[in-house]
Amino acid sequence: MKLTTKEFERLMQTVSAGWNEGDARKAADCFSNDAIYVEPPDAQLYHGRAELYEFFGGDSGTDIPMKMTWHHLAFNEEEQIGFGEYTFKLHGQYHGIVVVRIESGLITQWREYQYRTEMNWEIFTSQNPF
């Protein structure tokens, strides 16, 4: 099953909604059972939906709320590879980009690059806003 761009956007919005709502199951269910989640080269590495569920807060949730905002999402329907530019807050604030591979409607690979900063998105991108 190949996702359309709209379905990809819905999937990515579901991940962020799960994080924003403190619902680890909602977010983890967007990933395949054998998903790989990495921040290269090895800042973060998680394997599989069960491990991601715990990373996302598990049954007890995170100690402070997560906040995820997508600024841009793009998707190649043929290759089933998508990108998202985001701001994430948990223990610090990060602006970054993630590249994902989709198979059978779920995220199988997640690779993120992020920059920790206290600047808001508008200031962070002020030299090249869009």
Residue ranges and their predicted role:
Residues 1-33, 127-130:
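Short, low-complexity N-terminal intrinsically disordered segments enriched in polar/charged residues
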Residues 2, 53-130:
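A beta-strand edge to alpha-helix "cap/lid" segment located at domain peripheries
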Residues 18, 27, 35, 82-84, ...:
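Small side chains
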Residues 28, 38-39, 67-69:
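Short, hydrophobic secondary-structure boundary micro-motifs
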Residues 34-36, 90-91:
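Short hydrophobic/aromatic segments of transmembrane alpha-helices and their interfaces
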Residues 36-45, 61-63:
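A short gly/proline-enriched turn/hairpin at secondary-structure junctions
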Residues 43-54:
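Short beta-edge strand/loop motif at the mouth of beta-sheet-based domains
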